[in-house]
UniProtKB/Swiss-Prot annotation:
It holds the Pfam family Ribosomal_L14. Gene3D superfamilies: Ribosomal protein L14. This is Large ribosomal subunit protein uL14. Keywords: Ribonucleoprotein, Ribosomal protein, RNA-binding, rRNA-binding. It comes from Chlamydia abortus (strain DSM 27085 / S26/3). GO terms for cellular component: cytosolic large ribosomal subunit. GO terms for biological process: translation.
C-alpha cells in the first residue's frame, strides 16, 4: 500500500530514479493506493540528461508493491519493491521501455500500453 510520503522506484526509462508520493487520486479522502492506482508524485532522484527534472510534479501508475495483491482465484502476489511508471495526462507512459515484471491488474485497469511494453506480466 502506498500513501503520502511513500517513496517509490521508477520502472521506466524517463530518467527518474526515485519519486515521492504526495497525493493518491480517486477520492477526496482516499489514503492508500495499490497496483493499478494513479498517484501524483514529485521526482526526487534523476539520471543526467533525463526527460524529467528533479522537483517535477508528475502522475504515475503503481506497477509493483511489497504488499500482497489478493486475486479472485485465491492466489496472492507480492514484489520486492514499490515501483511506478510515469504517465502523461492521457494515461500513456512517458518512457519507451519498462523494466522488470508488472502485475496483471495493470491491464485490467486499462493501462494496455504499459502492459505491452513490460517484459513480463505476472
Amino acid at each position: 500500500m502506498i500513501q503520502q510520503e511513500s517513496q517509490l522506484k521508477v520502472a521506466d526509462n524517463t530518467g527518474a530514479k526515485r519519486v515521492k508520493c504526495f497525493k493518491v487520486l480517486g477520492g477526496s479522502r482516499r489514503r492508500y493506493a495499490t497496483v493499478g492506482d494513479v498517484i501524483v508524485c514529485s521526482v526526487r532522484d534523476v539520471e543526467p540528461d533525463s526527460s524529467v527534472k528533479k522537483g517535477d510534479v508528475v502522475k504515475a501508475v503503481i506497477v509493483r508493491t511489497r504488499r500482497n495483491i489478493l486475486r479472485k482465484d485465491g492466489s496472492s502476489l507480492k514484489f520486492d519493491t514499490n515501483s511506478c511508471v510515469i504517465i502523461d495526462e492521457k494515461g500513456n507512459p512517458k518512457g519507451t521501455r519498462i523494466f522488470g515484471p508488472i502485475a496483471r491488474e495493470i491491464r485490467d485497469r486499462g493501462f494496455v500500453k504499459i502492459s505491452s511494453l513490460a517484459p513480463e506480466v505476472i
